[in-house]
Design a protein with these regions (language model features):
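His/acidic metal-ligating clusters that form di-metal
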Residues: 17-30, 41-84
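Short alpha-helical segments used as structural interaction elements across diverse proteins
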Residues: 10-11, 41, 127
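A short acidic, helix-capping loop that chelates divalent metal ions and anchors anionic groups
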Residues: 37-40, 111-113
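Structured beta-strand-rich core segments of catalytic domains in phosphoester-bond hydrolases
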Residues: 1-36
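Metal-dependent phosphoester-hydrolase catalytic domains
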Residues: 56-68, 76-183
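Histidine-centered divalent metal-coordination motifs
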Residues: 33, 73, 166
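Phosphate-binding glycine-rich loops and adjacent basic patches that engage nucleotide phosphates
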Residues: 8-18, 45-47, 94-98
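Hydrophobic side chains within alpha-helical segments
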Residues: 36, 47-50, 135, 168-169
Length: 183
């Protein structure tokens, strides 16, 4: 799905989605990479709104269906308007579509995915920020999709090669329903 540019028109940034066949049922996942310019928060807000709209199409009943897992390079720090919009800390576009930040729930430390420990960022303008995320939608049947643990991958070079200029965020999530109410 093409994500909007500053004019609200489809642009080169994308959200790629799939519905995976799992032992627990059909599990929707989305991967994305939002605009990167420091001064384009307004564009990223349009882009996260488009992702919120996509989530609505992937779930028939948010209180019964498996939650949507969303990951990617959001190019925004946790207190930015676009991340606050996703996590319900400011007005959301769609009622019943809020995203829980897995690093915030179970990560350890700062979670910097754009780090000066990465050789590709030796001359970066603004290193040591958390720009990459894994989210799980709310509401959802408790505790489906809750992170058990969250960590960074690709932190160390392998065979002298750094995998990317960003570290990856990885999570183990709960896959069984508890029968409790949706909270």
């Amino acid at each position: 799905m093409a994500l909007p540019n500053a004019a609200g028109e489809p642009a080169h940034r994308r959200a790629l989605w799939a519905v995976l066949d799992t032992p627990w049922g059909q599990w929707p996942v989305i991967g994305t990479h939002l605009d990167h310019r420091f001064d384009e928060s307004h564009v990223r807000q349009l882009q996260v709104d488009a992702i919120s709209d996509l989530v609505l199409t992937l779930r028939n009943d948010p209180t019964a269906d498996l939650p949507v897992l969303i990951g990617g390079d959001f190019n925004a720090v946790p207190d930015s308007d676009e991340i606050r919009r996703l996590t319900g800390r400011t007005a959301v576009k769609n009622r019943n579509v809020v995203f829980a930040d897995m690093w915030e729930l179970k990560g350890d430390g700062s979670g910097h995915t754009w780090s000066d420990r990465n050789e590709y960022l030796a001359n970066a303008n603004w290193p040591n920020r958390r720009l990459d995320y894994l989210f799980v939608t709310w509401p959802r049947p408790k505790p489906l999709g809750n992170p058990v643990r969250v960590w960074l991958a690709g932190v160390e070079p392998v065979g002298g090669v750094q995998a990317s200029d960003h570290f990856a965020v990885v999570a183990d999530v709960l896959t069984e329903r508890s029968g409790d109410s949706n909270e």
